[in-house]
Amino acid sequence: MANGPTHQFLIFKIIPIDIGGIDFSFTNASLFMVASAVLSAGFLYFATSARSVIPGRSQSVAEMAYEFIASMLKEGAGTKGMKFFPLVFSLFMFVLTANLLGMVPYFYTVTSQIIVTFALALLVILTVILYGFIKHGFGFLKLFVPQGVPGILLPLVVIIEIISFLSRPISLSVRLFANMLAGHITLKVFAGFVASLGTLGALGIGGAILPLIMTVALTGLEFLVAFLQAYVFAVLTCMYLNDAVHPGGH
């Protein structure tokens, strides 16, 4: 159905590119990923390019975002984890900007695509693994051996810990993807009710009031969810990075 609630998630090619039978086309999803990266980086650049003792609104927002992520990273991974600040801050700003762009009518929500969120989650986990082995060598494997576990239970616990670790990119990506997908589908459904009832005359307009109120309320809620999901993604990233910095800390 062309105007169905899932139509907004369709991917179409803007610039078809085929190399050796592999599709590298530039799509609407690609466009909004680039837009999210450029807008977030551009905002931070212009907000901090003319720094002053008494900050303006844009500089205040940029500084609040910086302090917010810095505090989160220190709490989640300690002072040694601050070396990962550029990664966590970039991920937070990208996800937040992508989520907010998706709230604009007719714009594409790239975080509603599991392949996008999984790529971001995979980047986090690969960073944890690479840094863990580079910094600690095989000592990184202490991560899978919790302290205080009886020897008879250790093999089972190690298997559970490994499975839990490998499932992290799945849970991290699905959480973001599912929340954005479900929220936008719900908004589309209620907005569709309003549009359909509005065509039925006076009676329909009266019946459209409740769905309209619900749509406005859900829109406000989705803006909150857009921030919360970026926050949750960043918090979990900090927790996972803590395992790379302190593999024997649990």
From Swiss-Prot:
Gene name for this UniProt entry: atpB
Keyword terms: ATP synthesis, Cell inner membrane, Cell membrane, CF(0), Hydrogen ion transport, Ion transport, Membrane, Transmembrane, Transmembrane helix, Transport
UniProt record similarity statement: Belongs to the ATPase A chain family.
GO molecular function, one term: proton-transporting ATP synthase activity, rotational mechanism
Functional description taken from the UniProt entry: Key component of the proton channel; it plays a direct role in the translocation of protons across the membrane.
Lineage top rank: taxon: Bacteria
Keyword Cell inner membrane belongs to the record: yes
Assigned GO CC terms: plasma membrane; proton-transporting ATP synthase complex
Keyword flag Zinc-finger: no
Known partners and oligomeric status: F-type ATPases have 2 components, CF(1) - the catalytic core - and CF(0) - the membrane proton channel. CF(1) has five subunits: alpha(3), beta(3), gamma(1), delta(1), epsilon(1). CF(0) has three main subunits: a(1), b(2) and c(9-12). The alpha and beta chains form an alternating ring which encloses part of the gamma chain. CF(1) is attached to CF(0) by a central stalk formed by the gamma and epsilon chains, while a peripheral stalk is formed by the delta and b chains.
Pfam assignment, any one: ATP-synt_A
Organism, scientific name: Rhizobium rhizogenes (strain K84 / ATCC BAA-868)
PANTHER family cross-referenced by the UniProt entry: ATP SYNTHASE SUBUNIT A (PTHR11410:SF0)
UniProt-listed InterPro entries: ATP_synth_F0_asu, ATP_synth_F0_asu_AS, ATP_synth_F0_asu_bact/mt, F0_ATP_A_sf
Subcellular location: Cell inner membrane
Lineage summary: Bacteria, Pseudomonadati, Pseudomonadota, Alphaproteobacteria, Hyphomicrobiales
SUPFAM superfamilies named among the record's database cross-references: F1F0 ATP synthase subunit A
Protein name: ATP synthase subunit a
Transmembrane segments: 29-49, 84-104, 114-134, 143-163, 185-205, 208-228
Membrane topology annotation: Multi-pass membrane protein
